[in-house]
């Protein structure tokens, strides 16, 4: 069974977000998603300064099995990207909720966070797959 930290919020498309002290949110893909994809070989990230819209694809995770679009769980401006993934995409596999984060967003509408799933709700999504 996948690890689903309770302090995070989740999108049904397998992204997670974590609120940071500056009000931004860190975005990554769940352990379940990286298990399905397999070994990461390349990650394409948005650019700092890009505006992302909740539900729109904004990054790509490419593994030995497939390339998968990564969707923005919330709308806002990209304020940071995880440049370590450029040389070490395997961080997504080894530490999906830590060093394998994708990007940070300063939200334009924080109420979108309320529409995301808690750990229990995300587990239910996995169980239905």
From Swiss-Prot:
The gene is gcvH. Pfam families: GCV_H. Binds 1 lipoyl cofactor covalently. Residues 24-106 form the Lipoyl-binding domain. GO terms for cellular component: cytosol; glycine cleavage complex. The glycine cleavage system is composed of four proteins: P, T, L and H. Keywords: Lipoyl. It comes from Shewanella oneidensis (strain ATCC 700550 / JCM 31522 / CIP 106686 / LMG 19005 / NCIMB 14063 / MR-1). SUPFAM superfamilies: Single hybrid motif. The lineage of its organism: Bacteria, Pseudomonadati, Pseudomonadota, Gammaproteobacteria, Alteromonadales. This is Glycine cleavage system H protein. Gene3D superfamilies: 2.40.50.100.
């Amino acid at each position: 069974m996948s690890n689903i930290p309770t302090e995070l919020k989740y999108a049904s498309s397998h992204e997670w977000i974590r609120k940071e002290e500056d009000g931004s949110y860190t975005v990554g893909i769940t352990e379940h998603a990286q298990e399905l994809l397999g070994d990461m070989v390349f990650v394409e990230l948005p650019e700092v300064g890009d505006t992302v819209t909740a539900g729109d694809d904004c990054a790509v995770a490419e593994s030995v099995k497939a390339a998968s679009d990564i969707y923005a769980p919330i709308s806002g401006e990209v304020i940071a990207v995880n440049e370590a993934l450029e040389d070490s995409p395997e961080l997504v596999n080894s530490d999906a909720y830590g060093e394998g984060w994708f990007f940070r967003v300063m939200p334009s509408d924080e109420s979108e966070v309320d529409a995301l799933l808690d750990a229990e709700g995300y587990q239910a999504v996995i169980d239905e797959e």
